[in-house]
Amino acid sequence: SETRCKKYLKELFVPMAEYFISKGMYVVMRPPGVCPHAGDTEDNRYLGIELGDSYQEFLLKVWDIVSQNAVVKNNPGIMFELANEPVHIKGTDGKYGGDGDACFINMQKYFQAIVDKIRGNACNNIIWVPGLGWQSQYSGYKDHRIEGGDIGFAVHC
């Protein structure tokens, strides 16, 4: 819930981040859980993510809250990892997948909306964008680039 997100951001995550930053460390914030995917639930209702789905709405809300926090916003010690693996998205061809042009077209749109939400709050923290699959597929970003500054990729080796 939005109330819970604000509560724990204020009472737990911000103080934790401030502590680690005071010790000379960097902090990467990421939303809880993983991207919905096949096998994620007992009824297997998810095949992946898709434009405009409830998970994108969730991410937009979380990052809107986080990127407006006075301590977090523009803090050079805090970076944002937009989402966690596995990332399978419904492509422009109507099929779910973890690679290929059809998936990267929608991947760019999906995460560009989140980047735009963060930047729209005048928040310029470094942003780590996930790749497709198990955060190991990035080739499509050369043609379907996430726009903006201070953007990198969350690569899992």
What are these regions (language model features)?
Residues 1-39, 56-65, 112-122:
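Aromatic-lined substrate-binding rim segments of carbohydrate-active enzymes
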Residues 47-79, 83-157:
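Extracellular glycoside hydrolase catalytic/binding regions
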